[in-house]
Amino acid sequence: FVRRRVLMPRILIAECKQEVSTFNPHLSGYDDFGIRRGKELLDYHRTVRNEVGGALSVFDSVSDVEPVPAYSAFFITSGGTLAKAAWEQIERELLESIKSAPAVDGVYFCMHGAMASETELDPEGWLLAETRKIVGDKVPIVVSLDLHGILTDRMIEQSDAVVAYHTYPHVDF
């Protein structure tokens, strides 16, 4: 007989997270973000208590899920609007990491829901739409947001599930 190899579902992990305060007169730049890719993304988030760390603890607790690290850009302070050049670099790097990832069975995207750039007022929705173009309609995209994030029509249209914090301080990850 032939033994059939059962493949583990692959879940792509991506994060693009910033809370913008439009009252902050200073633009946020690329260097304000912590950027992590590949194994570094997984190693870091396995040591912290946040959304990605919570997701990884669930994935790691079962033997049949393979997390596929893509890209993480994280700046949680209430920074100013994201400068055009910084937005273009982050979105380019993030989308390139998704394009170069192996085929996946699902996407987990960690976002804040309150990001804005000089050229895109709905960066999260835009990233989800571009991610959808890359992975296709059959791959589910699940998004986590801060409890006061702004949920846009485009975000809803491009994701299969949206989950938000229920508590502040955030202890439900």
Where are these regions (language model features)?
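N-terminal amphipathic/basic leader segments beginning at the initiator methionine
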Residues: M8-V62
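Low-complexity, highly charged intrinsically disordered N-terminal segments
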Residues: L56-I98
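Active-site histidine-anchored catalytic micro-motif
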Residues: L12, K17-E19, G79, K84-E91, ...
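Gly-rich Lys/Arg/Thr-decorated short loops/hinges at beta-loop-alpha junctions or inter-strand turns
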Residues: I35-K39, A70-G79, C110-H112
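Residues at the starts of beta-strands that form the adenosine-phosphate
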Residues: R10, D64-E66, P140
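Short, compositionally biased low-complexity segments
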Residues: N24-L27, E66-P69, E157-S159
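Short, Lys/Arg-enriched N-terminal segments with co-localized hydrophobic residues
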Residues: F1-L7
